[in-house]
């Protein structure tokens, strides 16, 4: 067994000395921008999920460099916000000192894994040189009327001492609203908050999804979160009043089945009635104390009769008005038609309130009990009833979105300060001199009140300008602010130790050259948080002419989780976590990188197995040992080796193009088996093999390249060429895989059928023992592989 510790330390120092990962803005090459979702620097350091994701991008970065691309593959640290601050509080440290120390540790770990980052392009969101542009973008939003202070119902988390955006609130198993960070109770309360009008970009965000090479599930999550609905706003007159109620519906054909109107707790009419009706006021007070927000019809159908009647514009009959807790606040008009025969929520509510239930659409989707429209199919009736109500001036066609404006202020210390001063009339004014730096604050912990920690520093909060005293905004920006644009920040560091100004000619040239990001790799959990917010900011910057692409991220890959040995999500409480750093000492970075890529497809969740890592370390020894055999390098080699080498390259490159990294490793294994059989290799073939190996195991590849006397560095080698003429044959080698594990190959005539291949393997003495159990399933890829799944005993 070779000494991986000595070998890896040797090449780590040489790469550092020679700056092999230094990025150069080479305009003679096509660009390729590959991006990791940057981590927040926790004290725990890198976990296996980090290492898996970063190895994926590292392999693909090295591959594209070898293809001749000018690859930018940067890394940074998302160091502001709740995650970092909560860890700092738990550690009884100041978040500034704590995050800087952790960043140093992260860089040491990342370096040890051999990732090809150029740390001269590294950034952290807590750097005032960086966050002045976070503040600048906010200022542009403010001047465009897309950022404003509003008194709104917010999600308040007393334990965290801050407001949370809708996207940061989860529903637990009991149906209670809890914080994404820590799962603390969340309640509704009214507060003045900064909001960003992401709703102004709802249609643009929706339309932009069509041009993105993202997994369909992520697109659907964003589509559903934006929640576009095309329908009709119908006006109901209130009996004996000049007031009206407007409802939004996508199913106006059910209007003849409306037996009540339900209003949300925040509807203006409900609030007005509550002033004189103690029963309504008591109901609203009770609802405000509840944390339950999930739609569960069997439990959430409480309401109170407002003692008012509305006139159904289709039937001209009077129907009661209720305040009901199942009506979603802030969606549509805060009021819905109660059609209990055709809506589950309405049905539960009507049964509890003993309201009539009228079926107006039969099983054949035709209307009944609907006057002149009875007998029409549902779609036709929708059109004709809409037309009738529009003619009566009781309806208009409209579009609504579920997407809400982004609550952008947090009552915490560790975040970007707002570049805002309030005058004595409480009017906001933009601060032009940036950055507005975050002041030192010894007592930064939240106290449960709505006053942010920065409010305690009155010397900072109060600003004298002439005869006026201004007050700074003492809330800070959310943790998502700095990550909305960090992919631009890396580009602003090219050819500049500082950041190019975001609106400078130099920055725009770099944006034009390197955007969009060609490949973005990160977790699917950010679908309606970071990924949606970043798209919003990018589209705004596109409108401003700062960037020249409509979308920031062209292709997105969501890597699967690395599960514990017990097949469950890793967590300290379950005792199934694995620290990757000691594995470098015991097995080497190359072995861990290879194993994480070989475990399965990129998007799959995979169970950690120690035996798998041990096996990968043994395979590296096989590679090492082969290249240390005597007389293996020949001037010429036999036809089997020529064919095998070119087939290895062809299939490896095909898999790399499809990001099938586990299958590239399979091809390396197949070719190594062939080399042990033929015991011969040309120098060019050796370099070709080591070039592919270097994508996954750069340390050993570099060592073997040097051992053969070739010029360093193999990590700078170009892709070898495939001689396709060699592969034009009537014979193919088909792989046998049993329960997902490579077992060997046999040669067959091209086009051979599945049964012939299966029979040949089953009757071959070399493979017979593998078929001692009944077959559960056989997957055959013609001319390539037969994968046999055996029944477990």
From Swiss-Prot:
ATP binds at residue 572. It catalyses: tRNA(Leu) + L-leucine + ATP = L-leucyl-tRNA(Leu) + AMP + diphosphate. Coiled coil: none annotated. A motif ('KMSKS' region) lies at residues 569-573. A motif ('HIGH' region) lies at residues 39-50. Pfam families: Anticodon_1, tRNA-synt_1, tRNA-synt_1_2, tRNA-synt_1g. GO terms for cellular component: cytosol. SUPFAM superfamilies: Anticodon-binding domain of a subclass of class I aminoacyl-tRNA synthetases, Nucleotidylyl transferase, ValRS/IleRS/LeuRS editing domain. Keywords: Aminoacyl-tRNA synthetase, ATP-binding, Cytoplasm, Ligase, Nucleotide-binding, Protein biosynthesis. This is Leucine--tRNA ligase. It comes from Mycoplasma pneumoniae (strain ATCC 29342 / M129 / Subtype 1). The lineage of its organism: Bacteria, Bacillati, Mycoplasmatota, Mycoplasmoidales, Mycoplasmoidaceae. The gene is leuS.
């Amino acid at each position: 067994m070779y000494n991986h510790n000595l070998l890896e330390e040797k090449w780590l120092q040489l790469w550092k000395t020679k700056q092999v990962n230094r990025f150069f803005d080479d305009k003679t090459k096509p660009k390729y921008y590959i991006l990791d979702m940057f981590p927040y620097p926790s004290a725990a350091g890198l976990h296996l999920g980090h290492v898996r994701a970063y190895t994926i991008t590292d392999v693909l970065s090295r591959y594209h460099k070898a293809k001749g691309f000018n690859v930018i593959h940067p890394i940074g640290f998302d160091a502001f916000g709740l995650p970092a601050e909560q860890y700092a509080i738990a550690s009884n440290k100041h978040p500034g000192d704590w995050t800087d120390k952790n960043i140093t540790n992260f860089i040491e770990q990342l370096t040890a894994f051999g990732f090809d980052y150029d740390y001269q392009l590294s950034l952290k969101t807590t750097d005032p040189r960086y966050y002045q542009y976070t503040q600048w973008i906010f200022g542009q939003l403010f001047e465009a009327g897309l950022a404003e202070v509003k008194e709104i119902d917010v999600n308040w988390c007393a334990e965290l001492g801050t407001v949370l955006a809708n996207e940061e609130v989860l529903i637990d198993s009991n149906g209670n609203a809890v914080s994404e960070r820590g799962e603390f109770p969340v309640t509704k309360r009214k507060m003045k908050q900064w909001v960003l009008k992401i709703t102004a970009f709802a249609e643009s965000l929706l339309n932009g999804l069509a041009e993105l090479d993202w997994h369909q599930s992520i697109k659907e999550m964003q589509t559903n979160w934006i929640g576009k609905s095309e329908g009709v706003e119908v006006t109901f007159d209130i009996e004996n009043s000049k007031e009206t109620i407007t409802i939004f519906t996508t199913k106006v054909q059910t209007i003849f089945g409306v037996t009540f109107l339900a209003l949300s707790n925040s509807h203006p009419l409900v609030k007005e009635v509550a002033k004189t009706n103690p029963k309504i006021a008591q109901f609203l007070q009770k609802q405000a104390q509840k944390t339950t927000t999930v739609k569960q019809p069997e439990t959430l159908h409480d309401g109170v009769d407002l003692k008012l009647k509305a006139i159904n514009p289709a039937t001209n009959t009077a129907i009661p008005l209720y305040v009901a807790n199942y009506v979603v606040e802030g969606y549509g008009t805060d009021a819905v038609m109660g059609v209990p025969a055709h809506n589950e929520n309405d049905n539960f509510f009507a049964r509890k309130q003993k309201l009539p239930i009228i079926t107006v659409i039969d099983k054949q989707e035709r209307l009944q009990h609907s006057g002149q429209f009875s007998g029409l199919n549902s779609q036709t009736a929708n059109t004709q009833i809409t037309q009738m109500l529009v003619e009566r001036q009781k309806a208009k066609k409209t579009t609504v979105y579920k997407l809400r404006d982004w609550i952008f202020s947090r009552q915490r210390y560790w975040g970007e300060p707002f570049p805002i001063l309030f005058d004595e009339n409480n009017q906001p004014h933009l601060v032009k001199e940036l950055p507005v730096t975050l002041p030192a604050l010894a007592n930064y912990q939240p106290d449960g009140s709505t006053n942010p920690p920065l409010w305690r520093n009155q010397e900072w909060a109060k600003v004298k300008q002439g005869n006026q005293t201004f007050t700074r905004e003492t809330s800070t920006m959310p943790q998502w602010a700095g990550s909305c644009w960090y992919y631009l920040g890396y580009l602003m560091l090219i050819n500049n130790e500082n950041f190019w100004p975001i609106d400078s000619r130099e920055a725009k040239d770099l944006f034009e050259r390197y955007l969009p990001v060609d490949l973005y790799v990160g977790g699917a959990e950010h679908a309606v948080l970071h990924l949606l917010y970043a798209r919003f900011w990018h589209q705004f910057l596109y409108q401003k002419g700062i960037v020249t692409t409509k979308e920031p991220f062209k292709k997105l890959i969501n890597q699967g989780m690395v599960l514990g040995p017990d097949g469950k999500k890793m967590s300290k409480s379950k005792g199934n976590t694995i620290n990757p750093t000691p594995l470098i000492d015991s097995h080497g970075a190359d072995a861990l990188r290879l194993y994480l890529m070989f475990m399965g497809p990129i998007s799959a969740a995979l169970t950690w197995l120690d035996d798998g890592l041990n096996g990968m370390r043994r395979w590296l020894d096989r590679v090492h040992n082969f290249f240390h055999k005597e007389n293996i390098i020949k001037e010429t080699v036999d036809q089997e080796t020529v064919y095998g080498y070119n087939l290895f390259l062809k299939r490896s490159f095909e898999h790399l193009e499809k990001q099938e990294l586990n299958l590239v490793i399979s091809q390396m294994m197949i070719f190594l088996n062939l080399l042990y059989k033929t015991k011969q290799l040309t120098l060019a073939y050796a370099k070709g093999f080591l070039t592919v190996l270097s994508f996954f195991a750069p340390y050993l590849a570099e060592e073997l390249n040097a051992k053969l006397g070739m010029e360093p560095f193999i990590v700078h080698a170009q892709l070898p060429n495939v001689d396709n003429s060699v592969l034009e044959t009537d014979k193919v080698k088909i792989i046998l895989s049993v329960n997902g594990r490579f077992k060997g190959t046999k040669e067959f005539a091209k086009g051979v059928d599945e049964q012939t291949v299966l029979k040949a393997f089953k009757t071959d003495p070399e493979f017979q023992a593998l078929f001692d159990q009944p077959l559960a399933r056989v997957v055959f890829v013609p001319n390539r592989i037969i994968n046999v799944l055996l029944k477990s005993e």
